[in-house]
Amino acid sequence: MTYRIFETDGFKDDLAQDFGGRRKKILLKLRAYVYPKLAIQPRLGSNIRKLRNYSPETWRYRIGEYRFFYQIDEQKKIIFMIAADHRKQAYRK
């Protein structure tokens, strides 16, 4: 069964950033490649990692220097995209 992708308001705000002049390219990759891949298998892939010590369970997808964070609702089969940021800023609390 495939998962549905939901972009939270915070994630949409994060997507408004410039991404070092690569915004258009990153958005295209997210929607054309990453989302279809996550919809099928959100926990498996070389660019996917489960974050330790996060509650609720949080995952990240890496595209170059940028990190895209998401949570999975298994019962409803929904992936909530929650944040996007440069790797230098991404893990600061």
Per-segment meaning from a language model:
Residues 1-62, 74-78, 89-93:
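Basic, Lys/Arg-enriched alpha-helical interface segments
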Residues 84-88:
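Short, solvent-exposed aromatic-acidic interface loops
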Residues 68:
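NAD-dependent ADP-ribosyltransferases
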